[in-house]
Amino acid sequence: TTGVLWIAIVCAVVGVVLGLRQRPGPVAWWGPIGLGLLSLLAAPFGSGDHLNYAAYGRILVEGGDPWSESPIAWGNGLDPITSAVEAPWTTEPSVYGPFVTLLQGGAAAVGGTDLRLVVMAWQVLIVLAWLGVRAGLRMVLDREHHGRIDVLWTLNPLVLTIGLLGAHVDTIATALVVAAVAALSRWPGPVGIVAAGVFTGLAAGSK
């Protein structure tokens, strides 16, 4: 399995390099939006981190402290959401910042006791963040570079598998960092500095 994974990674890197050499044009917005919607039809894969996110959000909305209480200890290990967490994270309290934990709580509030619905609500946030990075980069970079954005981010196999389809929290942190850069680019002066500071703080409060 490890060998296959490394082969896939090498192929992805080669594909990105070849894509950059072709000087590609930008992809129409309907493509990434459609891809994002399709990603919601399948559960995240590659790791069980999305189950951790669901559990910490569940603990938060139920009045607990996800930074001090472990998933396995919550609800005597019988809670339909927290009991789904996989080893070795069953005994680990949250290591995530307050902002992203609030987002996890929002997903948990939407899904209630339905694990798939909680995870899907989280996936919606990931899709929005993934699209947000694309929008932010297009805002900062000249139009001639928009095709490169799609090669390096939107259609990058590593980003798609780990960030989008894996539903990792890093996608949200990345979106916030890009938003900070876009704010400085869009609003020079005090407004941009303040906005960038807010987005940077939120990124730091994610992971």
Per-range role (PLM):
Residues V124-A129, R148-A179, A183-L184, S206:
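Multi-pass, polyprenyl lipid-linked donor-dependent membrane glycosyltransferases
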Residues G25-V127:
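Intramembrane catalytic core of multi-pass membrane enzymes that act on lipidic substrates
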Residues L41-G46, L155, G201-K207:
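Transmembrane helix irregularities
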Residues D150, A179, A183-G201:
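Short hydrophobic alpha-helices at membrane interfaces in multi-pass membrane enzymes
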Residues G25-W30, L137-L158, W187-P188:
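Transmembrane-helix signature of polytopic, membrane-embedded enzymes
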Residues T1-L41:
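Start-transfer (signal-anchor) and selected internal transmembrane alpha helices
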Residues T1, L41, V100, G106, ...:
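Membrane-integral, polyisoprenol-dependent glycosyltransferases
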Residues C11-G19, L117-E144, T174-A175:
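Transmembrane-helix motifs of polytopic, lipid-linked glycan transferases
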